[in-house]
């Protein structure tokens, strides 16, 4: 099965790429745009707090992102309460940004772990108001199931703390989450290099979202290309089906007809 025939579907929308990327931490907007292009990503996330919605047309970040080429995913990065996150999503919608939102409600500044209690509260409100909610959450299958039951269009468990580059720290929880929910599972945060992205996709999840892993690399453009390849390779490997792990060797050549 080729990657071209294998689509990511979120709330009825089809995407060819299973890689989603952020727009922060780049050296320049020009570098960001080039990285987006080579990443092959179709969904681009933007922190609403970083965008001066009143300055459209005056060098605003959104002026550099082609809405015909990318699906914009506004996020609530920097929000620590449900009320703040809901207010941020409402402002984004009023400014003409997408109803498709990445919901973040953080618990503290040191770990940037999600506050699941506030997250669930915000998700309930936003779903009722017609938003398509993609929540950043902990790698807790119970919380992910609750988010699905609320009506979230996907769940986005962390692979490791935001910006840590530690990779997928608890693959077994990610596997359980994938078994538990029917909505897409997108690993968000912690991916540090291409092998991390490939490992995530080999678990059978539906996609990966990253920012620092690309923007923080020594060469963000090259890393964006590497992540593009890694996500596609990991997905294809999952679909192909890996061989089982065994303690002892198995000969790869037939033993029939051996001399002696």
From Swiss-Prot:
MF (Gene Ontology): thiazole synthase activity
EC id: 2.8.1.10
Q: What's a BP term from Gene Ontology annotated to this protein?
A: thiamine biosynthetic process
- Places the protein is found: Cytoplasm
One Pfam family hit: ThiG
The catalytic activity, as recorded, is: [ThiS sulfur-carrier protein]-C-terminal-Gly-aminoethanethioate + 2-iminoacetate + 1-deoxy-D-xylulose 5-phosphate = [ThiS sulfur-carrier protein]-C-terminal Gly-Gly + 2-[(2R,5Z)-2-carboxy-4-methylthiazol-5(2H)-ylidene]ethyl phosphate + 2 H2O + H(+)
User: Main localisation, per the record?
Assistant: cytoplasm
Q: Does the keyword Cell membrane apply?
A: no
Keywords annotated in UniProt: Cytoplasm, Schiff base, Thiamine biosynthesis, Transferase
What EC class does the entry list? Answer: transferase
Q: Where is the active site?
A: 102 (schiff-base intermediate with dxp)
Q: Which InterPro entries match?
A: Aldolase_TIM, Thiazole_synthase_ThiG, ThiG
**Residues passing through the membrane, by range:** none
What Gene Ontology cellular-component terms does the record carry? 2-iminoacetate synthase complex; cytoplasm
Q: In which pathway does it act?
A: Cofactor biosynthesis; thiamine diphosphate biosynthesis
Annotated residues that bind 1-deoxy-D-xylulose 5-phosphate are located at 163, 189-190, 211-212
Quaternary state and partners of this protein?
Homotetramer. Forms heterodimers with either ThiH or ThiS.
What role does it play?
Answer: Catalyzes the rearrangement of 1-deoxy-D-xylulose 5-phosphate (DXP) to produce the thiazole phosphate moiety of thiamine. Sulfur is provided by the thiocarboxylate moiety of the carrier protein ThiS. In vitro, sulfur can be provided by H(2)S.
Q: Which family does it belong to?
A: Belongs to the ThiG family.
- By what name is this protein known? Thiazole synthase
- State the organism named in the record: Geobacter sulfurreducens (strain ATCC 51573 / DSM 12127 / PCA)
């Amino acid at each position: 099965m080729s990657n071209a025939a294998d689509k990511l579907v979120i709330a009825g929308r089809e995407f060819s790429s299973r890689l989603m990327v952020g727009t922060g931490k780049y050296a320049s907007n020009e570098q960001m745009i080039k990285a987006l292009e080579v990443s092959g990503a179709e969904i681009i996330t933007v922190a609403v707090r970083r965008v001066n919605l009143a300055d459209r047309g005056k060098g605003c970040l959104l002026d550099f992102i082609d809405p015909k080429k990318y699906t914009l995913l506004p996020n609530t990065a920097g929000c620590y309460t449900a009320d703040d996150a809901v207010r941020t999503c409402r402002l984004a919608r009023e400014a003409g940004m997408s109803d498709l939102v990445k919901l973040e409600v953080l618990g503290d500044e040191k770990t940037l772990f999600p506050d699941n209690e506030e997250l669930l509260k915000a998700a309930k409100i936003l779903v009722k108001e017609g938003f398509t909610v993609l929540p950043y959450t902990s790698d807790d299958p119970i919380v992910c199931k609750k988010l699905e039951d609320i009506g979230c269009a996907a769940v986005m468990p962390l692979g490791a703390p935001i910006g840590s580059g530690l990779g997928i720290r608890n693959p077994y929880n990610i596997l359980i989450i994938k078994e538990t929910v029917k909505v897409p599972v997108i690993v968000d945060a912690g991916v540090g290099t291409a092998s991390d992205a490939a490992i995530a996709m080999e678990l059978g999840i539906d996609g990966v979202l990253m920012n620092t892993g690309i923007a923080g690399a020594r060469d963000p453009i090259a890393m964006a290309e590497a992540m593009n390849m890694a996500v596609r390779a990991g997905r294809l490997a999952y679909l192909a089906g890996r061989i089982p792990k065994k303690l002892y060797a198995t000969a790869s050549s037939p033993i029939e007809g051996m001399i002696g």
